C-alpha cells in the first residue's frame, strides 16, 4: 500500500524548494548578460582609443605634409593649413623690332636702330606667404645677357589698412608703371614712364581703406633717376648719396560696389615724390655720377640727353615729381590716362662759370582699349573667355588698342648756346608718339602683341631742324606662368 503520509510530506518539500531553485537559476541567468555587457563595454573603449590615436597620428602627419597645387597660372607648394606657401612663376617676353626708316637723311641725328630679335624679359621667380602674415617675392631678370634683380621684398600684412614693405620694389608713383608687365596693353610703356622711377630700395607703408575704395602708399627710398632703377646706379642697388626720396600715392575707386554699375570701373589718383639730389664730378670735371638720365623712344633710341664729357650737367638740388592719373573700364572698353610733371635742379660748370636752373619737364598719355571678343576690360588683363583648346572651338581673346603720348622738355635746357645744359643737335625738345596695336591672347598663358609706333620730334637735328620720325613695328611673344 502506498504511504500517503510520506508522499504528502515529499510533495510539500518539493513545493517549498521549487521557488528557491527557480530564483537561483534566474539569478545565474541575469548575471551572465551583465558580465557580457561589461566585457563589450571594455572592448568598445579599447577600439575608441585606438581610433583616437589613429586620428591624432593622421592629423600630425597631415600637418607636416606639403600640399602640391598645379594650375594654368602657377605651380605651388603649401602647408596643410595654407598659411605658408611658395609659388613658382615665370615671365618670358621674346620681341622683334623692325624700323621702317633704317637710314636717317644726311645731317639728321637720331638714326633708328637695327632690325632684329631680342629677349626683352626672362624672369623666373618665386613668391609666397610665410605663416599667413609675411608675403615675399624674389624676381631676377636674365634678359640682355646679364642678371638684374628686379624685385626682392617682403610685405608684413598686419591688417588690410596696414602693410609694411621692405626691400626692392616699384616706386609708388606712376599708374602704368605699377601695372604688371603682363597686364600692360602695349609692348612698351608710354612716354610719361620716362620721367618717373622704376624700382627702388627702401620701405613702404600702405593699405586699403573704406572697404577698398581708397588705397595709399607712403615710401622712404634711396632714390632713382627718371625712368631708372636702383640697379642702374654707379654702384648697382646701392645709394648714390645720403639724400632720400619721399614718395606718396593715393588712389580712389569711389564707386566700387556702387549701385551705379557703369561707374564701378572709375579710378582716380595722384602720386609724387620729392628729394634733394647732388651729382658729383672728379678732378678733371667729368661726372662720376650725374644723377640725371637720358630719354629713349620705345624703339630704344635716345632722343634727349644732358651734356657730358668734362663739363657735364649734373643734378644739383631739389627734384620733385607729381603725377595725377585715372582710368575707366566698362564692359569691353577701357581708358587710361596719366600726366607727369618733373622739376629738376641742375648745374653745369664751365671753367670759372657756373650755370644753375630748375628745369620743368612734362609728359602725358591717353590710351584706349577694346575687346572684340567681349571680355571685360580692367586694370589687370582678363583671361580669355574662350581660350584655345586643341580640338575645341575657342581661339582666345582679341583686343584692339590705341595710344597717344607726349613728352615735352623744358626749353631752358637748350638756352645758353655752348653753355646750355644739353646739345640741341641730338636732343629733341619734344617727342610725340602715336601707337596702334592688336593683342591676341591664345590662353591665359600665351599672348602675342603687335604694335606700330610713330614718334615725331621737335628739334634734335643740325641747324634746328626736326629729327626724322621714328617708325617702328614691334612684336612680342609672351609666356607667363
In which residue ranges do the predicted regions lie?
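Residues that define the transmembrane beta-barrel architecture of outer-membrane proteins
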Residues: 71, 84, 111-122, 148-150, ...
